[in-house]
């Protein structure tokens, strides 16, 4: 069964004596250059004249008019071709599709790509998709930064109590360390408390004069030894 546009869309039969040169208005508005036109067998009426004039009109206007995607016509084969090509490109670049789904620009991702694996840099928000307020901060990092200075002070105090030479701690005075060590020794006395008290008094006297003595431990360890 042949199919064609209804005759009501045409103002009248197309003249056959134009030599194949149809007007632009007829080729664009009334019929499509690539529209299949089937003429009934044995017909010599207006349908055969239309079939004779459609092909020369498409050739006169060039290949741009003959392409359905150039004119915006929803041709089945053209959209199918575009869909296959788009799906092939998406399978070829899966990370681009992931960035588009997250709403990030491709240029931004390329500029921030070298910073993804840096240990000293915070992880960018491009991969997780969270704002800085929503992103949780690890508690280990906060606790380490907050307790780093007290750990050093406690370690220095323990070394002084054990009689191990210490190095100056930034932000901590030597007088405070000696006072803390004396307070600790008073709170935890030992059998030879008198000897220890005399030793700490001698150390305090040297500190007041501007010299930090090298106090030997009770176990007879040399001044430069470690725990």
Curated annotation (Swiss-Prot):
It is a single-pass membrane protein. GO terms for biological process: cell differentiation; spermatogenesis. The chain crosses the membrane at residues 152-172. Its main location: membrane. GO terms for cellular component: membrane. Residues 1-23, 204-227 are annotated as: Disordered. InterPro entries: SPATA25. The keyword Membrane applies. The keyword Methyltransferase does not apply. Expressed predominantly in testis (at protein level). Expression is lower in patients with obstructive azoospermia than in fertile controls and is not detected in patients with non-obstructive azoospermia. Keywords: Differentiation, Membrane, Spermatogenesis, Transmembrane, Transmembrane helix. Pfam families: SPATA25. It is found in: Membrane. May play a role in spermatogenesis. Belongs to the SPATA25 family. PANTHER family: SPERMATOGENESIS-ASSOCIATED PROTEIN 25. This is Spermatogenesis-associated protein 25.
